[in-house]
């Protein structure tokens, strides 16, 4: 399934935190691969191969804690019951992110300019950048005699680090969702020829709410274009 987001062309928005505990191997195929992997595979292809039931044969549980109150837990499982293979993973990760302090921001400058006019300050500086992140990953695959059903769901929520107006604000949330589902059949003949008909669905979704300025901030406006402030909003 597609790793690169069709919106940005990059894999670093959704898969930058993909759990390595669920990766069996990484394939790097150099050179053009458009005939097999689509029109964008004109220089190389990187395939991420995840574990199947026979690779795991049980349950692996891992977790960690680190700087900036970073915590995560990961479960990888796989088992064969007769001719039925079941495998998957569940993972949670949260971090407060970099705790850098912004001493002054755009709203600080506006507050300074408007203070003689009696406007109350609204800047949240000095304050921390908004670099938190929270992620859920779920994957499940069931296979029987070459037939299989598989699904993946990734949900990310994060802060923007700082607002697009270079001001501290505390109500922003950048949410990214990725989901795929697939039903198919795979048959290999003498390890040289494989047939794999399949039906699949991929969806990338962005739900962003970015607070440009903190509550109570005032914006000087030049409504008539003469270079002078004539309105404060």
Placement of each model-derived feature along the sequence:
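Face-selective signature of the C-terminal outer-membrane beta-barrel domain
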Residues: 141-157, 176-233
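Transmembrane beta-barrel architecture of outer-membrane proteins
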Residues: 13, 41-43, 64, 70-72, ...
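Periplasmic-side early beta-strands and strand-to-turn transitions of outer-membrane beta-barrels
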Residues: 8, 55, 64, 76-173, ...
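Short beta-strands and strand-coil junctions in structured, solvent-facing domains, enriched
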Residues: 2-5, 33-36, 95
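N-terminal periplasmic accessory domains that precede
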Residues: 12-16, 28, 40-64, 71-77
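Short acidic/polar hinge/loop motifs at secondary-structure boundaries
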Residues: 2-30
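Membrane-embedded beta-strand positions in outer-membrane beta-barrel channels/transporters
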Residues: 25, 30, 45, 60-62, ...
């Amino acid at each position: 399934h597609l790793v690169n987001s069709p919106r940005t062309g990059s894999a670093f928005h959704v898969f930058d935190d993909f759990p390595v505990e669920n990766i069996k191997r990484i394939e790097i195929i150099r050179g053009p691969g458009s005939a097999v992997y689509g029109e964008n595979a004109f220089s190389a292809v990187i395939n991420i191969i995840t574990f199947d039931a026979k690779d795991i044969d049980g349950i692996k549980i891992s977790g960690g804690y680190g700087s900036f109150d970073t915590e995560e837990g990961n479960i990888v499982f796989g088992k064969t019951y007769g001719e039925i293979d079941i495998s998957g993973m569940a993972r949670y990760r949260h971090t407060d992110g970099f705790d850098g302090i912004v001493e002054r921001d755009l709203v600080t400058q506006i507050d300074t300019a408007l203070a003689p006019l009696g406007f109350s300050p609204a800047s949240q500086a000095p304050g921390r950048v908004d670099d938190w992140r929270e992620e859920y990953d779920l994957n499940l695959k069931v296979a029987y005699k070459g037939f299989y059903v598989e699904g993946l769901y990734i949900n990310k929520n994060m802060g923007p680090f700082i607002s697009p107006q270079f001001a501290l604000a505390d109500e922003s949330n950048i949410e990214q969702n990725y989901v795929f589902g697939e039903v198919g059949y795979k048959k290999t003949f003498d390890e040289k020829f494989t047939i794999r008909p399949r039906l699949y669905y991929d969806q990338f979704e962005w739900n962003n709410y970015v607070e440009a300025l903190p509550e109570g901030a005032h914006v000087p406006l030049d409504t008539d274009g003469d270079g002078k402030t004539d309105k404060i909003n």
